[in-house]
Structure formats: C-alpha cells, structure tokens
Amino acid sequence: MSDRQVVVVGAGLAGLSAARRLRTLGIEAIVVEARSRVGGRTEGGLTADGSPVELGGQWVGPTQTRMYELIDELGLETFPTYNTGKHVVQLGSSQTLMASHRGAVPKLNPFVLADLFQGLTRFKRIADRVPLDKPWTAIDAKALDGQTFETWIVRHLRTSTARAYFRVAAEAVFSAESCNLSALHAMFYAHSGTDLEGLLSVDRGAQQDRIVGGSVRISERMAAELGERLHLDCPVRQVEQDGSRVTVTTRDGRAFEGDRVIVTLPPTLAGRLVYRPILPSWRDQLTQRLPAGSVIKLYAIYDEPFWRHEGLTGQAASDQGPIKVTFDNSPPSGAPGIMMGFMEADDGRAAARLSSTERREAAVDCFVRYFGPKAANPLEYIERDWMAEEYSRGCYGAHFAPGVWTEYGPALTEPVGLIHWAGAECSAVWNGYMEGAVRSGERTAEVVADELR
C-alpha cells in the first residue's frame, strides 16, 4: 500500500466501490459517512416476523454485469422477482389483465397499440443515437434538451392511452412528472439502461432479479472490508483544498486529510457542502439544477401472497394514483406475502403532506383496487419517505430539467482541482441505478489512482 490516501465522502454503493477499487490499486482510502449505516439509497428493514424488506434500491437485471460480478465476489446470491401469472393494467377507465410474458406493453385496441408502438419505436431510434459519454453532443441535442419530455409525448403520440403509458413510465423510472425533465435526459437515460421497455420490464429487464437478504448486504459486506477506515455518523461540512492536499471537516470538527477526495453524494447534496476555495460557477450552477425524484416506498404485509393463488403476479400499472406501480416483494420462501408500491412524483409530494395513517389508508385502497378485498387488512404496514431523508432528500436519482445537459453536462464529472465526483448520476452506463453507482465509483477510483501514481 502506498503512502497516498484518498478521502471518500459517502458510504453508498459508489463510495464503497471507489474505496474498494482504490485499495486493490494500492492506495489507502478512508470513507466518511453522515448516516449511522452504510448503503446510501439502499436500505434494509425487517417485518415483524424478521423477513427482510428493501426500503430503497433493490433490483438487478441483464447487462448490469458489474453488479452480478460484485454479488458473486461478496458471496451473495440473487433470486428472480416473482413474475408468474398476469399483471393488472389500468389506463383510463378500463382495468384489464395482461400476461406477464408480454413484457412492458399491455394489450390495447389496435389503433392505440399502433400509436404506442410507433411512439416507442421513434423514442428508441432517437435514444440509441445519444452518446452515453457526452449526451450534450447528440444530434439535435439543443432541440431535445430545450423541450420537456411531456412536450415530446404530446407531439409524437396521438391517443390519450398511449400518452398515459409514457407518462406513467416517466413516473416509474424517474419518480418525476414528464413535464419535469428534458426529452434529451429521458432518451439518454433509457439508452444508458438499454431501452425504455427494458427499464420497465421484469424478465430480461431492470427488475429481473433481487438479492437474497436485501441489496444493502452488498454495502455491508464492502464496509466490513474497510474496518476502522469507515467512519459513520460523520456528516461532512466542508471540503478544503490547497493545491496539494485536501481536508474534509465534519460538523463536529473532525478532520480527515488526503491527497484527493471523491465526493459521492447526490449532486444537490454535494452542492450544499462548503468548499474552500468556493466551487467554480459552472459546477455550483449544475448542482442547483439537479433535483432528486419524489418517492415514498410502501409495503403491506400479509400472511401469504394471496394474489398468486388468483393467478396474478402482484404487479399493477395504472395512470391513477396515488400508487401507480406495485410489485410482489415476498421473500424466496413465498411467505409472508409482501406487497410493495410506490407513491411517486406529484402523488409522492402530495402524500408527504399526509400522516402515516392517511398514507396507509390510501395505499391499502390502491391495493384493494388492483387485487381485491383480500388486500384490505394487512398485518403490517411499512414505509420509507425518501424525500424526508436528510442525507438523500429524494430518490431514485437526480433528473435533468430542460437545458441542463447542454449547458452544464461536462461539469457532472469534471474534477475541481483535487475534488472528484462519483455516484449513480455520474455513470454513462445504467445511470441512476445501483450498477451505475458501482461503475462510477470504480471508474473514478481508477482516474484518481492514475493521478497519484
């Protein structure tokens, strides 16, 4: 191990992956984390009977090669998301059942289906041309980034049902309304994770597999390798650099010194730290323009997954909230039955103003609407409001409003002196996902290691 040292701010997947890679490259790393736990936007919880629930990010799927490799390296295992039977689909006034093998495209009348397919085809054709390493250089980048995704939807889809499909997709993927993000960002993001249908699918899609014991076990096992080099309950207040060294100071006055620092906080939170000297305007202005998504993740616990006995997957997709997307999140054994739903975007922000009791009532009403009266009396209710988390302030990740990619894109990962940036939002591949966080952390560690050699 060399005498060089790097301070990593944040013990989520990006920060821990960065520290792990640095140490394999012979450079010492210490990790400073504000929370009393590791995992960042992945978090574990337990039901009353001790069954694990995942309060944050949880899925892995095809082409997320680094995640599967890491799971294997750490001695963990995956199991498939339950996807046997039919999905409940509610678009407009009609509620239908759709066989799970149809993927992410529901059964619709021929006119609507034709409209949806041409929209998906057009979207994919443009998205596939967006350079993942430099989205702002895409063909027609200014035009795409100058309009909201909602504007693109209205211009290129003719039927209300096809438009509703894209709007629900935006909420499910970004936990934001289609009017909150630029069309360029929607296309970059889809291309980053293969394509839009892949982001929405289970089999052969982003929701294909889960991790036995919960995704937070990845962070916990990486953290165990660090030992005393991991410092919890250390909210960072200031990052100071003098041209040769960096000093990271916590709120209670503790100081950690290094040759470089890797900040792995979500961009908006990274912008709230104090920097000495102050950040250049091009970086600070970027952090002011990358809001996190709005989401509350909710669970209803039952004796068993009763929906399975009725031939249902436990998955619902609807354009009527407050829960528009659900999944069967039961453990591999199949018991207890764990129904999971999301309150996202406008629905999430509205629900955040309610009491937990009111949110529970609203959630159960949605589960009953999708899966019938047996959903009315859960044994237990669990929720995590990510907007209320001090060191996240939202999930799943940051989204780019119109104009941000083309005006500030290079600033996302460009170092500022001795300060480097990493995180799920900084990855060209699987941006915003656990895979992206790991890739970004490792890539940034390699860049830093090259500088210090």
Which residues fall in each region the model found?
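Conserved flavin/dinucleotide-binding core of flavoenzymes
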Residues: 16-17, 25, 195, 245, ...
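N-terminal Rossmann-like FAD-binding beta1-loop-alpha1 element of flavoenzymes
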Residues: 4-31
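Core beta-strand elements of the Rossmann-like FAD/NAD(P) dinucleotide-binding domain
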Residues: 2-4, 251-260
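Short hydrophobic core segments
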Residues: 9, 32, 236, 255-268
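Glycine-rich FAD pyrophosphate-binding loop
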Residues: 23-48
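Conserved beta-strand-loop-beta-strand element in the redox core of flavoprotein oxidoreductases
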Residues: 240-256
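Active-site/ligand-binding neighborhood in enzyme catalytic cores
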Residues: 131-235, 243-245, 264, 274, ...
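Flavin (primarily FAD) binding-site architecture
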Residues: 263-281
